[in-house]
C-alpha cells in the first residue's frame, strides 16, 4: 500500500470513529471541504455549517447512532467503505415521531479525496430497510 493510501485509510477510520464518538469537530477536520451527499434522500450538505446541521438532525433522531466497519477498499481517488449503521429512534425525524425502535442497515460510502483530505462523502443505502424496522408493527 502506498503512503497516500495509508494516510487516506487512516483519515477515513478517524472520520468514522469520531462520528461514533460524536466528536464532530474532529469529523469536520478530516475534510478538505465538508460535503455529504445522501443519495437515497437526495440531500446534499455542503460546507461546515450544513454538515454540522446534518449531524445535529441525525443524532437528535438517533442519539446512539453508530457505524461498524465491514470492509474497506481503495481506488485512485477514493476509499470505498461498506459498513453497518445502527441506532435507536429516540427523537423526531422529518415529521416522524420517535418509535423507540432500533435499526441496522448495511450501507456503502464513497469517500472522495483531494490529496489526503476528504472532499465528499457519498452515501448509498436502502431507505426501506430502515423504515421497515422503525415502523414494524404500525
Question: Where in the sequence are the language-model features?
Answer:
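C-terminal and inter-domain tail/linker signature
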Residues: 1-138
Amino acid at each position: 500500500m502506498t503512503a497516500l493510501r495509508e494516510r487516506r485509510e487512516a483519515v477515513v477510520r478517524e472520520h468514522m470513529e469520531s462520528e461514533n464518538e460524536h466528536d464532530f469537530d474532529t469529523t469536520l477536520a478530516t475534510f478538505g471541504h465538508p460535503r455529504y451527499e445522501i443519495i437515497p434522500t437526495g440531500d446534499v450538505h455542503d460546507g461546515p455549517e450544513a454538515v454540522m446541521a446534518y449531524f445535529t438532525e441525525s443524532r437528535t433522531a438517533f442519539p446512539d447512532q453508530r457505524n461498524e466497519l465491514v470492509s474497506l477498499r481503495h481506488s485512485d481517488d477514493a476509499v470505498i467503505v461498506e459498513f453497518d449503521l445502527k441506532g435507536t429512534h429516540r427523537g423526531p425525524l422529518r415529521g416522524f415521531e420517535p418509535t423507540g425502535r432500533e435499526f441496522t442497515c448495511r450501507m456503502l460510502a464513497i469517500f472522495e479525496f483531494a490529496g489526503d483530505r476528504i472532499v465528499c462523502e457519498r452515501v448509498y443505502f436502502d431507505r426501506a430497510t430502515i423504515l421497515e424496522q422503525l415502523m414494524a408493527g404500525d
